[in-house]
Design a protein with these regions (language model features):
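Cytosolic covalent-transfer regions centered on His/Cys nucleophiles
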Residues: 13-188
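N-terminal non-cleavable signal-anchor helices
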Residues: 4-5
């Protein structure tokens, strides 16, 4: 079944019908849109300057370390505003999603591109008030524009699918270089 809408001229005459969408085409589009390894890849948003091997004791220290890396890589337009947005989001509900992973994020006006900073905490985990009660070892801090929700959801979806794989999480914790970390996201 195809969904259509009547189309009218400016003078009030009926022009005919306009095809809005065909469910088969819509389903195909959505599959392609969210397909693993499709047109968008997480590696597009990664930068070796934004991979941080952490040795911190608190959530605040981890957040600060990643924000410092973002600022050092000139990704932040307003460091205090970004920091505040990250903390404000964390107050709403913990970004500790479970499996030892946290995804703090902020979308602000004035940004043109998304970016992801990765924090890897080897050894003891970080208390993050995670949904499953686990301590955090992997942190993915996402930042970018507030007017591109679709792209943001794609990034979040791809990242979530990638980190669900336990072997990838184990490999991330064993990585010793930023290149190794970024290589683990090729094709994601």
């Amino acid at each position: 079944m195809t969904v259509v809408q009547e189309s009218w001229n400016f003078n009030g005459r009926k022009r005919g019908f306009r095809k809005l969408f065909d469910p088969k085409n819509l389903l195909r589009f959505l599959r392609q849109f969210f397909k693993k390894g499709g047109p968008m890849s997480l590696s597009e948003y990664l930068d070796d300057r934004l991979v941080v091997f952490l040795d911190v004791h608190s959530q605040g220290d981890a957040i600060e370390s990643l924000i410092e890396a973002l600022d050092g890589a000139h990704k932040l337009k307003d460091k205090p505003a970004f920091h505040k947005a990250i903390l404000d989001r964390e107050k709403i509900v913990s970004t500790g999603i479970g499996l030892g992973v946290a995804i703090p994020h902020a979308k602000l006006s004035g940004y043109e591109e998304f970016f992801i900073a990765i924090g890897i905490q080897c050894g003891r985990g970080i208390e993050w008030n995670s949904l499953d009660g686990s301590q955090v070892h992997l942190i993915f801090m996402i930042g970018g524009p507030d007017n591109r929700q679709t792209e943001y959801l794609k990034i979040l979806s791809r990242l979530t699918m990638a980190i669900k794989e336990s072997e990838r999480r184990k490999s991330l914790l064993k990585a010793t270089s930023a290149k190794q970390v970024i290589d683990l996201f090729k094709g994601c």
